[in-house]
From Swiss-Prot:
This is Iron deficiency-induced protein A. It comes from Synechococcus elongatus (strain ATCC 33912 / PCC 7942 / FACHB-805) (Anacystis nidulans R2). It is a peripheral membrane protein. Residues 1-36 form the signal peptide. Disulfide bonds: none annotated. The keyword Secreted does not apply. CDD domains: PBP2_FutA1_ilke. It is found in: Cellular thylakoid membrane. One of its GO terms (cellular component) is plasma membrane-derived thylakoid membrane.
């Protein structure tokens, strides 16, 4: 596999100065815990956010453990791990979407951790946001919501994901393709909640309500909704946060035309997907790898995830990005993220039969 598909970076002690909010806790505690760990950790990451790099530098500063980062697309990183096999230098695999983490477990790429082996990880992450065998743990959350054009829709008209198949929304719904992992995971959760037959019927109704054939990512759906191409968009909340912060005045103006609705609040709650990480089964530096995961779930790192990319933190008590907080509080679905991937294949098949391209 071509090395040009990946980006390599190292984070050394004494790197770029960091925001003061990250330096509030004791260096000594992390130093003591690092004494039994190896001196470096090799990280394969499918996340591409500068704020993550800030966290890695801070980890190195606090522990003395060097982080060697390889960035790439998640599917390419999974293929690389499979190709490298027991020779892989990777210690930690990080990616967005629970479905991709499930793929890693199916390929036997990740090491299981018991609660006795990793009490801090089990304490930090709720059961529905981690693998039942401790092979991966959520690092951040992203809610997939209904966004609506405030000039065309009243919130009282909205209720559930299931209601999006109602004919009253004919030619009004904007959403990306069925092959997108976020839509696959949403549909996978609906299979778990409603059953495959009802979910397929829902998908058929949803397709009938498309404002246009799916095209582009979440941001184009939101912008099209603001422009009146449709009235509703299915998208992750952090994409709207980015538009509010855009350097382009027209994108900020578009964001102001959009409101967020959290579906299924009287039922199971709103679908929440994750970014997550696990220790590679053949990790040459397993103690350093576990310490990195524990740091990523510390209050300091969680605050950076929340503020830097507009994601929801996994750890309780961590402040949200002010724009994200402005969308309001909501009830989250407690359906295990592990089923999103388990239902991926079935989800794609029924979406295809429904005509969701």
């Amino acid at each position: 596999m071509s090395e040009s598909m990946f980006s390599r970076r190292d984070f050394l002690l004494g790197g770029t100065a960091l925001a003061g909010t990250l330096l509030l806790d004791s260096f000594g505690d992390w130093r003591r815990r690092a004494e039994a760990a190896e001196g470096e950790v090799n990280l394969y990451s499918g996340r591409h956010y500068n704020t993550d790099n800030q966290i890695y530098r801070e980890f190195t500063q606090k522990t003395g453990i060097k982080v060697n980062l390889i960035e790439g697309e998640a599917d390419a990183l999974l293929a690389r791990l499979k190709s490298e096999g027991s020779r892989s230098p990777a210690d930690v695999f990080i990616t967005v979407d629970a479905g991709r983490l499930w793929q890693a477990t199916q390929a036997n790429l990740l090491r299981p951790l018991t609660q006795a082996q990793a009490p801090k990880l089990y304490q930090a992450v709720p059961a529905n946001l981690r693998d039942p065998q401790g092979r991966w743990f959520a690092l951040s959350k992203r809610a997939r919501v209904i966004m609506y054009n405030r000039d065309r829709v009243n919130a009282s008209q909205l209720s559930t994901y299931e209601d999006l198949a109602n004919p009253k929304w004919r030619n009004q719904i904007l959403v990306r393709s069925s092959s997108n992992v976020y839509n696959l995971s949403l549909t996978g959760e609906m299979i778990a909640a409603d059953g495959a037959a009802k979910t397929e019927a829902w998908a058929r109704g949803l397709v009938q309500n498309f404002a246009r054939q799916p095209q582009g990512g979440d941001t184009p759906q939101i912008l099209a909704c603001a422009a009146g191409v449709g009235s509703l968009a299915i998208a992750n909340t952090y994409y709207l946060v980015r538009l509010f912060k855009s350097k382009k005045a027209e994108e900020r103006e578009a964001a102001r035309k959009i409101k967020v609705f959290f579906p299924n609040q009287k039922g199971r709650g709103t679908h929440v997907n994750i970014s997550g990480a696990g220790i590679v089964r053949t990790a040459p530096n397993p103690r350093a790898a576990q310490l990195l995961l524990e740091y990523l779930l510390s209050s300091q790192a969680q605050a950076v995830f929340a503020r830097g990319n507009g994601e929801y933190p996994v750890l309780r008590g961590v402040s949200l990005d002010p724009i994200l907080a402005g969308f309001g509080q909501f009830k989250e679905s407690k359906i295990s993220a592990s089923v999103f991937g388990a239902n991926n294949a079935q989800a794609l098949q029924l979406m295809d039969r429904a005509g969701w391209k």
